[in-house]
Structure formats: C-alpha cells, structure tokens
C-alpha cells in the first residue's frame, strides 16, 4: 500500500479529551475518530489491526470446535422479560419501541437470543455438545463513557455460548475454551494472565478472566510467586500471615477519644499500631429492616463481593446510613465495635487472630483498648472478608502473593442452567426424559484488545505493535523518491516484499514532507520494521534497517534485505 493511495490521518497534537495513552495514540495514529460520546469510527489503519484480532480469534474458536453464527444486535423485549433481565438490567440497557409500539433493546449481550435459538433447534442429547459464537457489535449505554475504546458505548465483541446435557460435558468445553483463549492472547503477542473470577449474579460453577498486564489497567490481579495460582482481587482468598492468636498482655480499659473518628486519627493520637485496630462496618441484611456488622483489621480493605456473598447479607452491599446507625446502636460510624453490639457479627479471619486491640465502644468519643477474644467477648462468625495485600500467603500454600494492574479483555463462565431453566431450553436425554441444558458463556472484547495492546506496548514516540498485530509489518521510506535511482530501487523492493507476502506501507509522499516527519509518523503508527532507501545508501550498495524496538539503525546489503526480513518477522 502506498501512502498516496491511503488515508494516512496522523495528528501531531494530542486531543485534550483523551486521557489514557491508548485513546491518545489511536487518535494521533489515525486509527479512530470520535463520532459522539463513547462512539467511534474505525479508520482504515485501525480497522486493519482489529481485523487481525478477529482473524486470530476466529481461527482459535474454529479450532476449538465452535461454529460461527451471526445474531441480530436488536433484540425483542419478550426474550429479556422471559429470562427476568428486562427488569433486572439497569439503564445500560438501551430500550426503544418500533413503529408498532413493541419494545426492543440494543443488545449488550446475547444469552437470551442464543438460548431461544437453541430451544428451537435442539431436541435430542445426540445434538450435544454444541458451541456457537459470533463477532458482533454490542451496545451498553454507559453513564460516563471514557478512556476511548476502553469504556465506550458501542464495541465489538466475540461471544460464544455452549450447550450441554450435563456438567461434565460443560467442564470439557470450558477447559477447551480456556486453552483457546490462552492461544489467542499468546498469538497476539500480549503479556496476559488468566485469573479466577467471581461469577457474581450470573452464578454457576466456574469463571475466569483474562487480563492484559498494564500499569494503566483498572483491575488488580493477584498471583503467586511460587505457583500458577492467579485470581482477580475480588476472588482472591485472603490467608492470614499469622497462624495463631497471641495471649493477652493488656487489661481491658475504656478510653475517652474525642475527635477521633477515623483509624488514622486513632493511630496518631494514641500511638496505637494500625494492625491493632479494627473497622466495624454496618450493612443491610437480606431481611428488610435488619443490619449486620462486618469487621476487618484497620489496615485492610473490605472486599464488597466477598461481603455480599455472606449468608444473611444483602446483595449488592448497602452500607447503613448514619440515622440507621444511631437508631440501632446509639453511636456514629467512628465509634463502633463488637463489644456489646446488638447485631449479628461477621469478622475477617485476620481479626480472629488479633489480641490487645482497640475498638469503638458504641458510645460516641469512646473506645476500648486492650480487647481480647474469648476473655472480653466471644469469637463471632469468621469469614474471608478482605482484599488480599502483596505478601500474603498464596491460598494454595505455595509462595506469596503479588499484585499487578490488568485490563480485562476476556471472560469465560460456566452459566449452569440460569437461562436454560428460565427459558425452558430442554432436550430429550438418553433416558427419554427432558433435560434442562447446561450452558457456558465465553467473551472476548475484540475492540478492547486493540486498546489494551497499545496500553501495554508504547513509548514516547507512539505505538509498538507486534508483527502479528501491526497494521503493516514494514514501512518502506524512500528519501528523494522523485529521483530515478531511488524510485526504481524502492519500487523493485516493494514488489519483492509484497510478492513474499509482507504487508508494506510505502511512504511515497512528496518532498514537501520531510524525512523526519515520515519517520515520526511510522513510529507513531507503530510499524515494527522500517527500511530506508536513499541515494547515499544505494551508492554503497546498502539500505537502512531499523526495528521499532531498537534505538539504532543498521546498514543491510540490498541483496540481503528480503532474506533478513523473512528471518526476522514473525508471521
């Protein structure tokens, strides 16, 4: 491809509304253009990259035995009402009526549509297992679209759905899809980690997220330095570093603590180690009008997913208001504790192992110090309530935990029968009786992968694409292309490279565009390999080669360029 025949839409300045680096570079490299909030047009340069992601995803899905379909992006309300999600789904579901007054939505996901298809097409266990996938536009009406393609309203997604007669069959396909996802991200040249994840409201027996590692990632992912254990922060089990509770060394005492409403103030005023403090958090119970106390150590953070999964706790988690606290306990949030607390109590595992600690006295401006379990109050219900921190023991007993930032680009679920049961998706089983199908769900954010790859691979000059993802593998930059010698050598090499199957962008812009601008544009776009053709080089029988990841260029004999690139470029 020649730049004279291409839409080369690079920009020198960074748009003011672009915050994250992927958004900035995709705009500057001429990959996308904003249409409206959360809506983007893919320009030729960007679309070439996305099509490469799609191709690899498609190849791995086909290799895993999945069959491609294409479902409508517009979905009738009746299916969502049947599954119960029409009422459950929030304002992210864009709803509208057609000219006949019938309700529809713009599909953010396709569980209902695929389940309807399966119940109409499948009748016998002999047709199972079946795994169907599509690559389709999705729409979620995000309240605050931001970060370009990282959190837009319209996006491209690969979603697959599998159907099974039993859990054992689902597990086989789930494992196969897990491997297929690992294959996809490996082939894309990305540093990634699959991590255990919480199923949340979807339910089911298993769930994994796939994260591209990047400092700009929105998610914390946890992994062991001594094993393959990995999970997201919501799912990771917090194992206490302590193995036993020290014996009491202090007497229980009631202390006046005026103007001490926070853990930080308590630590500073009374020289109390933060590890000897607790946070008492009061939340709504499942039973209307009731409250439950959740207690974690002062230096730990409550994991709201774990907390909401506790028996009796309302989900999603709702914190009690100050009025509710005063009505139920008689004190404000900064003075609460488990001693004489008239509520059910759940404490974190690390709290159970504390001794001689400080707590609120359930009286404003008063705390108890020197508190000890069993001596001063009974040990209540114990559960895993907190987020892990770096250095915690790995739950599998091998090594300690490290935490990195990641961008979620894929998620696989074992759905169980959540949708098939609600929508009566059944087949006749081997015994001739109806069987409700088990389902799996497997998603990859195709357009999000493009942005995540840039977040992981960039420098001060622009994007750094892998050979697999780059819009073009080679930038061919002639200096003084208008001269006969340079033009003939450039055109000859261009023909040889394209005939060899390479994707080449020949920068044939005229002499008004300086070499510096040409080089800067190619680096901004992120083309992995650059060949420069010049009078001086040709006079010496050489061309100049530079890798996008290397600082220095090198001279190559003209006759060796093709073989050099064939050996170097991963295809």
Curated annotation (Swiss-Prot):
It is found in: Cytoplasm. GO terms for biological process: prolyl-tRNA aminoacylation. Coiled coil: none annotated. PROSITE patterns: AA_TRNA_LIGASE_II. Its EC number is 6.1.1.15. It catalyses: tRNA(Pro) + L-proline + ATP = L-prolyl-tRNA(Pro) + AMP + diphosphate. GO terms for molecular function: aminoacyl-tRNA deacylase activity; ATP binding; proline-tRNA ligase activity. It comes from the Bacteria. It holds the Pfam family tRNA_edit. One of its GO terms (cellular component) is cytosol. Keywords: Aminoacyl-tRNA synthetase, ATP-binding, Cytoplasm, Ligase, Nucleotide-binding, Protein biosynthesis. PANTHER family: MITOCHONDRIAL RIBOSOME PROTEIN L39/PROLYL-TRNA LIGASE FAMILY MEMBER (PTHR42753), PROLINE--TRNA LIGASE (PTHR42753:SF2). Homodimer. Consists of three domains: the N-terminal catalytic domain, the editing domain and the C-terminal anticodon-binding domain. Catalyzes the attachment of proline to tRNA(Pro) in a two-step reaction: proline is first activated by ATP to form Pro-AMP and then transferred to the acceptor end of tRNA(Pro). As ProRS can inadvertently accommodate and process non-cognate amino acids such as alanine and cysteine, to avoid such errors it has two additional distinct editing activities against alanine. One activity is designated as 'pretransfer' editing and involves the tRNA(Pro)-independent hydrolysis of activated Ala-AMP. Belongs to the class-II aminoacyl-tRNA synthetase family. ProS type 1 subfamily. This is Proline--tRNA ligase. It comes from Pseudomonas fluorescens (strain ATCC BAA-477 / NRRL B-23932 / Pf-5). The lineage of its organism: Bacteria, Pseudomonadati, Pseudomonadota, Gammaproteobacteria, Pseudomonadales.
């Amino acid at each position: 491809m020649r730049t004279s025949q291409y839409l080369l839409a690079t920009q020198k300045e960074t748009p003011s509304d672009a915050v994250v680096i992927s958004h900035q570079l995709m705009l500057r490299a001429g990959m996308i253009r904003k249409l409206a909030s959360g809506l983007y047009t893919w320009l030729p340069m960007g679309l070439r990259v996305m099509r490469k992601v799609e191709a690899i995803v498609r190849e791995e899905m086909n290799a895993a035995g999945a069959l491609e379909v294409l479902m409508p992006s517009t979905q009738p309300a009746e299916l969502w009402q049947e599954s119960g999600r029409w009422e459950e789904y929030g304002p992210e579901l864009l709803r509208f009526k057609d000219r006949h007054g019938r309700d529809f939505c713009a599909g953010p996901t396709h569980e209902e549509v695929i389940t309807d298809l399966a119940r109409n097409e499948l009748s016998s266990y002999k047709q199972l297992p079946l795994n169907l996938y599509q690559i389709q536009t999705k729409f979620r009406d995000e309240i605050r679209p931001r970060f370009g393609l990282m959190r837009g309203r319209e996006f491209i997604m690969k979603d697959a759905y599998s159907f099974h007669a039993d859990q054992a069959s689902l597990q086989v396909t789930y494992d196969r899809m897990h491997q297929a996802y690992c294959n996809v991200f490996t082939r894309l040249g990305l540093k990634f980690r699959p991590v255990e994840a919480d199923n949340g409201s979807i339910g089911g027996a298993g769930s994994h997220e796939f994260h591209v590692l990047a400092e700009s990632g929105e998610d914390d992912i946890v992994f062991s330095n001594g094993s393959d254990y990995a999970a997201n922060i919501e799912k990771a089990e917090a194992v206490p570093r302590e193995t036993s509770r020290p014996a009491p060394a202090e007497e229980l005492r009631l202390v006046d603590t005026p103007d001490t409403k926070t853990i930080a103030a308590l630590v500073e005023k009374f020289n109390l180690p933060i590890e000897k403090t607790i946070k008492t958090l009061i939340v709504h119970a499942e039973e209307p009008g009731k409250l439950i106390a959740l207690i974690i150590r002062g230096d730990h953070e409550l994991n709201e997913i774990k907390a909401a999964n506790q028996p009796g706790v309302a989900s999603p988690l709702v914190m009690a208001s100050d009025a509710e606290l005063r009505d139920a306990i008689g004190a404000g949030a900064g003075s609460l504790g488990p001693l004489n607390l008239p509520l059910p109590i759940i404490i974190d595992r690390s709290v159970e192992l504390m001794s001689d600690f400080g707590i609120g006295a359930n009286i404003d401006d008063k705390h108890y110090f020197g508190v000890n379990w069993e001596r001063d109050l009974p040990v209540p219900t114990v559960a895993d309530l907190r987020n892990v921190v770096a250095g915690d023991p790995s739950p599998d007993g091998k090594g300690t935990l490290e935490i990195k930032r990641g961008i979620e680009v894929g998620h696989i679920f074992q759905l169980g029968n959540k949708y098939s049961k609600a929508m009566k998706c059944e087949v006749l089983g081997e015994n001739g009786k109806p069987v409700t199908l088990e389902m799996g769900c497997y998603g990859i954010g195709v357009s999000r992968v493009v942005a995540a790859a840039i977040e992981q691979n960039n420098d001060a000059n622009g994007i750094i694409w892998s050979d697999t993802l780059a819009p073009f593998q080679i930038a061919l930059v002639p200096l003084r292309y208008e001269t006969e010698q340079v033009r003939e050598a450039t055109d000859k090499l261009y023909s040889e490279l394209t005939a060899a199957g390479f994707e080449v962008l020949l920068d044939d812009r005229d002499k008004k565009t300086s070499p510096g601008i040409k080089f800067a544009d190619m680096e901004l776009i992120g083309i992995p390999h650059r060949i420069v053709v010049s009078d001086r080089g040709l006079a010496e029988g050489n061309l100049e080669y530079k890798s996008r990841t290397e600082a220095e260029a090198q001279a190559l004999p003209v006759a060796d360029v093709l073989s050099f690139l064939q050996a170097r470029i991963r295809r």
